[in-house]
């Protein structure tokens, strides 16, 4: 093959994912894998979008960590582009930061508080464990690329769906949302989650932050486990009634 053909194939192969995600907002597309050792975090491959560009993490990055019992945020910083004769380089820097604010050129991967003598973990027992304060990697505020606006981690919606599903007999409104969460390969859109939360809890607000969405889903999950449907009736109590003529 000629050099021109090879360059065309190379450029086209990278254009395919860009076209696929061109209508998405900034945010994670494929979250970086994170392997935890006693003293280091090993950040693996991932794909994200920022300012209309796709960034692919191809090489692992090792970052040291230690207990502080204060929030530490694992961030990606998008560096200014650099020019050379043959190409333009868009590079990133991954680091731990004690500043919990996310600057305009940064994106959050996750955050944690670590106690002395403890080890950071990312295997969640249940939905509520996603928000455990200490010794647990928290991804509730990690933005995921979506249509119209960034959305929340699919770990949140999948944990919600798995726990809620066994309790939703006779709750078709909840079943529809839960099946979407369980079957979707991509993160669930923020618009759908917001519409579900607003209808389920009779809320008027049109926008919720990531931690607000998590809190509302937690409230809904508690109601579902009690048998309380969207119309306010307790399905369990109603099903147990015996009518005698």
Question: What kind of region is each of these model predictions?
Answer:
Residues 42, 48-245:
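Beta-strand-rich solenoidal segments
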Residues 1-48, 54:
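N-terminal "first-domain core" detector
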